């Protein structure tokens, strides 16, 4: 509606520019806001999209006509034109703008995958430095390929879009409406991805990459997907931008542009779709409309108070400095941005806070229980497992067998190798030697997400929830490996996808109901707002959501008071009675005695005892390892 209310062509053009940067901010928001990958070279993909259309539509590039171009002429992508020197024919590229929007997005996504595949295993500052380098390389390549990009002079004569015979030319109004449509489309894509299985996987990686892998997310694949989709957004926007300007030069895509887009994302609200659009539009309006006027006011003030330097201030030329100041201020005083991505936690009513604890039934697990009742068949077999950290032997030839339907406790002093054992079983560490077989299949050296897919879920000694996701979303992430919706399904939202999501939400609520009104009333609360005990319960609920055949609990009652310990121990016992196979690390030996069918004792990375709790508690080696603390068994 803006062009109908305000017919100033320059202001409409500024509005189209603001929307173009909003589209770029939406793409970077997928990379930074959803997946948590710091990209300082995002303008490179903007350039790739721009040059893709520029090369395909500019009169400036006119290679000699040969038979090679004839198939493209049949497709109406090129035409044959008389050369300017009058000798021979040359190629005139005439690819449609509307065709190039998705094509440039695909080209940019391809380069995103090509660049990301070898680099996205890097993290933090290392990834930022590599992306910064890539962002600098692309303009350099454009400057040094004159036969394709016309070098430092840039491409001129880029064809304006046409629609139903109408040529956009330099009229700002049609570009504005195209920009509105483009931003609306990218917002819809962003929002649908965010609330889907794909978006939850990205946000899990952003919050805790290790926990995301352990709960079934293929981290490299999903980071690469985020990079590719973010690059596609930039590629499509680059095509629009160069079509509007009808020129493309390397200076349009330098490092300051990447920083400006990042500031827009931070300013609006990292991870919030509406927020980054608002942030981009506001900052572009500041740059286009207000800085020049503000400079004039400062000049007038300088003349009024006779201050010479105020009379020469040009704020527009200091836009990078201004954006840098905005970034610093936002990081210091409002990191969540103008429109935070996280929703405020709704306080529980007094009745909910003081209600008697009521738990759901464990019939939710009946499908698992029916399949994995206790048998004499080993579910997990660990043989000769050795893990070294330099000269330190963390695990030395450890053997362990876990029968289906049993509870096995692993105990030992601090530093005895218990958590290392769990980390190796679940793929977070690769053993130096030995084998791990689960349900008859070797799983040693497989990735954490593969181990989870096979049926082993775990909790961590130090709780690793996704703090910026709700309790319900944490449990839904736990179902990642058991759901099938990909990015295309998330975008189309077909009945099958909607049905799968509805069933997943229902299943998640049923799992939360296992912990009664400890968790169910808090389903919409951020995990970071929970008490310590409820964070423990939520982590177990998330592990159960993956429908595990084997559940590994690393010190589940650590940090809990006696009442909370008793309550959680009863719930673990209920899981066992429902047929769940459990291996737990536990220091509270009364919990071990009450729950475990078998106890394995580690000391300095070696197994020193194994057997029923009654037998192990009298073992002399165990008594020596615990320095008398075995009295806790009594």
Predicted segments, located by residue:
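The feature captures the beta-strand-to-loop junction immediately N-terminal to the Walker
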Residues: 411-413
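Transmembrane alpha-helices and adjacent helix-loop boundaries
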Residues: 1-367
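Conserved catalytic motifs of ABC-family nucleotide-binding domains
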Residues: 547
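Catalytic Walker B motif of ABC-type/P-loop ATPase nucleotide-binding domains
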Residues: 551-555
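Conserved ABC transporter NBD signature motif
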Residues: 434-442, 454, 507, 513, ...
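Helix-to-loop junction immediately C-terminal to a conserved catalytic motif
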Residues: 426
């Amino acid at each position: 509606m803006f062009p109908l209310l305000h017919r100033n062509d320059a202001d409409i053009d500024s509005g189209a520019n603001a929307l173009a940067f909003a589209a770029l901010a939406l793409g970077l928001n997928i990379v930074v806001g959803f997946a948590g990958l710091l990209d300082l070279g995002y303008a490179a993909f903007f350039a790739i999209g721009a040059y893709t259309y520029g090369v395909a539509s500019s009169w400036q590039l006119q290679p000699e006509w040969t038979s090679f171009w004839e198939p493209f002429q049949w497709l109406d992508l090129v035409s044959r034109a008389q050369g300017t020197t009058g000798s021979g024919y040359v190629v005139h590229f005439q690819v449609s703008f509307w065709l190039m929007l998705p094509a440039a997005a695909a080209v940019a996504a391809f380069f995103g995958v090509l660049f990301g595949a070898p680099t996205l295993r890097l993290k933090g500052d290392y990834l930022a430095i590599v992306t910064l380098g890539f962002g600098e390389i692309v303009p350099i390549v454009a400057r040094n390929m004159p036969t394709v990009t016309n070098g430092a002079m840039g491409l001129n004569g880029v064809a304006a879009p046409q629609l139903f015979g109408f040529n956009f030319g330099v009229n700002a109004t049609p570009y504005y409406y195209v920009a509105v449509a483009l931003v609306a489309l990218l917002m819809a894509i962003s929002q649908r991805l965010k609330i889907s299985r794909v978006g939850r996987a990205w946000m899990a990686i952003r919050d805790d990459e290790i926990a995301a892998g352990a709960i079934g997310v293929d981290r490299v694949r999903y980071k690469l997907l985020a990079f590719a989709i973010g690059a596609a957004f930039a590629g499509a926007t680059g095509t629009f931008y160069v079509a509007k300007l009808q020129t493309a030069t390397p200076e349009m895509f330098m490092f300051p542009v990447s920083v400006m887009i990042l500031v827009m994302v931070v300013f609006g609200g990292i991870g919030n779709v509406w927020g980054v659009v608002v942030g981009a539009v506001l900052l572009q309006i500041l740059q286009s409309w207000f800085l020049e006027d503000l400079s004039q006011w400062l000049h007038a003030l300088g003349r009024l108070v006779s201050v010479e330097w105020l009379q020469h201030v040009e704020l527009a030329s200091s836009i990078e400095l201004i954006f840098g100041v905005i970034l610093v201020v936002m990081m210091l005083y409002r990191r969540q941005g103008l429109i935070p991505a996280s929703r405020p936690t709704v306080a529980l009513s007094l009745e909910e806070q003081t209600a008697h604890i009521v738990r759901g039934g464990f019939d939710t697990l009946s499908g698992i229980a029916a399949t994995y009742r206790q048998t004499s068949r080993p579910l997990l077999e660990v043989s000769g497992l050795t893990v070294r950290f330099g000269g330190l032997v963390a695990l030395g030839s450890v053997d362990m067998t876990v029968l289906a339907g049993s509870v096995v406790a692993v105990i030992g002093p601090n530093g005895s190798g218990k958590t290392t054992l769990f980390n190796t079983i679940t793929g977070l560490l690769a053993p130096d030697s030995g084998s791990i077989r689960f349900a008859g299949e070797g799983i040693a050296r497989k990735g954490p997400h593969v181990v989870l897919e096979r049926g082993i879920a775990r909790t961590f000694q130090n709780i690793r929830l996704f703090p910026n996701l709700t309790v319900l979303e944490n449990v839904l992430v736990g179902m990642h490996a058991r759901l099938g919706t990909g990015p295309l399904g998330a975008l189309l939202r077909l009945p099958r996808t909607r049905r799968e999501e509805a069933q997943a939400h229902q299943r998640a609520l049923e799992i939360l109901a296992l912990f009664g009104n400890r968790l169910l009333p808090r389903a919409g609360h951020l995990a970071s707002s929970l008490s310590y005990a409820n964070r423990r319960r939520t982590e177990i609920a998330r592990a159960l959501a993956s429908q595990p055949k084997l559940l590994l609990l690393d010190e589940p009652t650590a940090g809990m008071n006696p009442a909370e310990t008793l309550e959680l121990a009863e719930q673990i016992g209920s899981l066992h009675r429902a047929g769940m196979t459990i291996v737990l690390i536990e220091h509270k030996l009364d919990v071990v005695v009450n729950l475990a069918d078998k106890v394995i004792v580690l000391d300095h990375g070696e197994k020193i005892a194994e057997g029923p709790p009654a037998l192990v508690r009298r073992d002399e080696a165990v008594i020596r390892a615990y320095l008398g603390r075995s009295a806790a068994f009594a």
